[in-house]
Amino acid sequence: MQVRSISEYRVDRDKWAEKTFVEHMGNISAEVGRAITAHRNGNKVREDRAIDRAIDLFSATVDVWIGTEYSYRLKEVLRARDEFLRLFFDGTFAEDADNIDRYFTYYAFLARNQHHEQQLQMKRVYANPGKD
């Protein structure tokens, strides 16, 4: 059995397309946070893997939103990707890491809150069948 590193896995584009923009950015947030934490801890292997996964999620998000009526979302996704990559490759990590992490963390909180609200709504529907 061949063991693959986690960075060899790619997001399922069909399943990814079913998610909302906020869910996309919330999931990207997790990889951004992992990359920043790994960088701060000096773990280059984990940092590289998290960056690789984040790039894959950014690419999948661009694929979803390009050519749609909501393609205005692309500007934000592409700008966020550029800022994330600049953080690791332009030598500005110390100055910008907290701001970039904070930006993405807001999406993570929003995505989690929306998921929680959907779960509560489903519980209400199942608790009161036949009522809206």
Question: What does each model-found stretch correspond to?
Answer:
Residues 1-132:
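Surface-exposed peri-terminal alpha-helical interaction modules
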